[in-house]
From Swiss-Prot:
Substrate binds at S92, N108, V109, R110, G258, G259, R260. This is Oxygen-dependent coproporphyrinogen-III oxidase. Belongs to the aerobic coproporphyrinogen-III oxidase family. Homodimer. Keywords: Cytoplasm, Heme biosynthesis, Metal-binding, Oxidoreductase, Porphyrin biosynthesis. The active site is at H106 (proton donor). PROSITE patterns: COPROGEN_OXIDASE.
Length: 310
């Protein structure tokens, strides 16, 4: 498939662009680059910024790996593809800010190709982005979802609501009965209507991520915070760790396929904490996160209703 080279070129360019923009807004640290090879086939480049002025740790990873047999995490929903050789390439990033008022965020765009001698390759795209605030602001939630909606709109009226719901359902800690954050977009197994359109969509998602995230960083980066806010941020980061290690398909795929553990676990926060039976104080900003932000909401419909009433 000659189209694979175009996807790879886009992904490498996306990684470079995102790193440049994040380093520029941080202003206190730069990305360290770590190129690596995988014994089973392929390799990648991990870029990590640590100890920044704004970002405590940010990892932006590119990988292009090959293998002789799809691991279970990639073929669970497509049992007909079990045993096929595969290529997988993508950019995955996680941003853990220092300030508790700036949300953690994650984004990913990827391409899978499953191959079998004598048959046409089976390909599909996946990805999305999501936001995990510690202290919620409605203005930020509406902006985040408006950005997601607008980039989806050229591809059909049903795309945003479908992928928003998928995101709400996917980034949910079943063992806690609790959402990880306020969602965004999530999609997988995308191969319709054709390769060109599917590729155009992941370009829109990848290029649109910082349009959603950086304005939130700018709004919140200078807010004062102290030990209370930091403790709550670290406690909520524990939920992030739980999701990634228990439920995340990307983490499971990486580990099951013999991926590079350092790069796979790059998504982990540098610090997190757990408390036994933690309960936020009633009517506190911490309680508002659970009450007003973690339950799935139609942020855009609520915003439009409010604007009409105003």
């Amino acid at each position: 498939m000659s189209d694979i080279n175009a996807v790879k070129h886009f992904l490498l360019s996306l990684q470079k662009d995102i790193c440049q923009q994040l380093a520029a807004i941080d202003g206190g640290a730069d990305f360290a680059e770590d190129e690596w090879q995988r014994a089973e086939g392929g390799g990648g480049c991990s870029r990590v910024l640590s100890g920044g002025r704004i970002f405590e740790r940010t990892g932006v990873n590119f990988s292009h790996v090959t293998g002789k047999s799809l691991p279970p995490s990639a073929s669970t929903h497509r049992p007909d593809l079990a045993g096929r050789s595969f290529q997988a390439m993508g950019v995955s990033l996680v941003i853990h800010p220092l300030s508790p008022y700036i949300p953690t965020s994650h984004a990913n765009v990827r391409l899978f190709v499953a191959e079998k001698p004598g048959e046409e390759p089976v390909w599909w795209f996946g990805g999305g982005f999501d936001l995990t605030p510690y202290y919620g602001f409605k203005e930020d939630a509406v902006h985040w979802h408006q950005t997601a909606h607008d980039l989806c709109q050229p591809f059909g009226d049903d795309v945003y609501p479908r992928y928003k719901k998928w995101c709400d359902d996917y980034f949910f800690l079943k063992h806690r009965n609790e959402a990880r954050g306020i969602g965004g977009l999530f999609f997988d197994d995308l191969n319709e209507p054709d390769f060109a359109t599917s590729f155009a969509f992941i370009r829109a998602v990848g290029n649109g991520f910082l349009d959603g995230y950086l304005p939130i960083v700018e709004r919140r980066k200078d807010l004062a915070w102290g030990e209370r806010e930091r403790d709550f941020q670290l406690y909520r980061r524990g939920r992030y760790v739980e999701f990634n290690l228990i439920w995340d398909r990307g983490t499971l795929f990486g580990l099951q396929s013999g991926g590079r553990t350092e790069s796979i676990l790059m998504s982990m926060p540098p610090l997190a904490r757990w408390e036994y039976q933690h309960q936020p104080e009633p009517d506190s900003p911490e309680a508002a996160l659970y009450r007003d932000f973690l339950p799935a909401r139609d942020w855009l419909a609520e915003s439009n209703t409010h604007n009409k009433e105003a």
